[in-house]
Amino acid sequence: MKLLMVLMLAALLLHCYADSGCKLLEDMVEKTINSDISIPEYKELLQEFIDSDAAAEAMGKFKQCFLNQSHRTLKNFGLMMHTVYDSIWCNMKSN
């Protein structure tokens, strides 16, 4: 499960590097770490990225990993992601 989380985050970061301007990445991360969003709501919000039942199940498990975390951990994760957004690697593509 941890490997799945790392791979999904790596894919999101690569998408950011691929000239998304990081807005899509920021929105997805915010939805992922928002503990007020349930798994069914999360899947619905990200439906355009889910192309199979296996992907839907993986997204549900991915969201559950974050739902299992404390508020403090989620806050720290959000802070870490904002540090990534503000890094030279994301800003380099938007300049």
From Swiss-Prot:
A GO biological-process term: androgen receptor signaling pathway
The keyword Glycoprotein appears for this protein: yes
Keyword annotations of the record: Glycoprotein, Secreted, Signal
Chief location bin: secreted
Keyword Transferase: no
Signal sequence coordinates: 1-18
Subcellular location: Secreted
SS bond partners: none
Pfam families linked to this entry: Uteroglobin
Tissues where this protein is expressed: Expressed in thymus, trachea, kidney, steroid responsive tissues (prostate, testis, uterus, breast and ovary) and salivary gland.
Coiled coil: none
Sugar-bearing residue positions: N68
InterPro entries associated with the record: Secretoglobin (IPR016126), Secretoglobin_sf (IPR035960)
GO cellular component, one term: extracellular space
PANTHER family, per the entry: MAMMAGLOBIN-B, MAMMAGLOBIN-RELATED
Role description: May bind androgens and other steroids, may also bind estramustine, a chemotherapeutic agent used for prostate cancer. May be under transcriptional regulation of steroid hormones.
Family: Belongs to the secretoglobin family. Lipophilin subfamily.
Assembly mode: Heterodimer of a lipophilin A and a lipophilin C (mammaglobin B) monomer associated head to head.
Protein name: Mammaglobin-B
Taxonomic lineage from the root: Eukaryota, Metazoa, Chordata, Craniata, Vertebrata
